[in-house]
Amino acid sequence: KIPQTWMLVLCYFTTFGGFMALTAWFPTFWKKAMGLDPMLAGGLTAVFSILAALLRVPGGRLSDRIGGEKVSMGALALLAVAGILMNIPMGWGATFVVSLLISVAFGFNNGATMKLVPVYVSEGVGGANGWVGGLGAFGGFVFPPLMGRLVDISPQYGYGLGFLLFTFFALLVMIINYFGMIRKK
């Protein structure tokens, strides 16, 4: 009914769904793509997940101060760049640092998206939050099979290429959000 709701759904699909997807995906990535033992793979994944979850709060606070649109666009730009960087051959330590950039982007954008719901859908915040949260979480089920398919197609490059899905979605959301923000104003 309200087009901006779908803009917010896609935004949350990309970063909250992405958070869920990579929390499930990273143990396999660290073991198979980077050759790490399962304990270290689990530890790196835990740091990624905890950081993204904790950064929702400062993402929301910063959105209160400077606006959710600015925080969201900055976080999505960071995600787009980090998705590209995950394709550059580097050691596991540098790759982990880039994964933390993705975590920062996810956390900040998730906080910003929740700030934007009452801004764009003030007449139906509760219902819109249901749509944004419910359909946004669906990204957690969509991304892993797509990433797995890329590994099937190209075992050597597929793990890195999977992160380009986040680059693509981040850029798509930035474009849609830009035009959605113009329409709202």
Model-derived segments and spans:
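Intracellular juxtamembrane helix-capping segments at the cytosolic ends
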Residues: 108-121
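A late C-terminal transmembrane helix in Major Facilitator Superfamily
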Residues: 123-155
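A membrane-interface helix-boundary motif in multi-pass transporters
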Residues: 149-169
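Helix-to-loop junctions at the C-terminal end of transmembrane segments
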Residues: 55-67, 151
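Multi-pass alpha-helical transporter architecture, strongest
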Residues: 164-185
